[in-house]
């Protein structure tokens, strides 16, 4: 298995971001990312997917070998779409659409029709910022997802950077503070979103969780002050999605795109907050009688299942079954649990950073049936 770091859900000048695709690629290379997925609002930008090198231009990338792994001289830029009904007020029900080669914004007025369109086109889709509260001091509306009766979407964006930001800026003074000290913002997904995820999993559905930066690199003006707040390279070092591939990236765009979206659709990934410390190397696996599984997989409970989690450095590890804690390991590198009952098992990991306990890793479930 091979781990890559993906940052997804970001915006360029084609919608409400401030940068170009080349700007974003440069920031991603600087941050050490492997892949970025751009998702402008209601527009599918064509012709810009590819491997970008430090010069900022797409170019063929050589096959990756052991000697080139870990280098940050190139990044794969893929393009998706964030689709929502622009005639709706407020504009709720945003959907992240990946691996679709045509604009689906004409379907935005009905979320289920949109999801069906994604599936018919061979794509995958995720509910964006499920809980996204208002921020009256900045005239920002609540744009949470409301159409929870929909079916057949791939998953949800468990941790969205700006959604969390909106909870800590009741005044413009708070906003000014966090504009200069963004490292103090991140604590974890919205509690309502975590609970919603567990509730959805309890229905028997497989719901994949992603982490999204929702990066815009916004320009802030307050009197004489001007600042680019939350620049792309900051976002790219914070909330990421680490994806587990069956083989390394090859350098061929079509091949690698298939690998990445295949792994995301299966839930072979985890949500990571890489700002306190790199989460590379986290694993959550299971072994049963003649079977094994990684995050997103299903295996039989008969005969017992051993669940194992490993983290890159000592941290607090929580094991949850059907949304309830069944194991807690403090200041530990690893956790092992023998599961004798069916259930949806997932792991949360917490780390101390800047004097506070913060969410670090949220693994996708292993389904023991």
Predicted feature residues:
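C-terminal functional module detector
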Residues: 2-3, 23-24, 203-209, 213-369
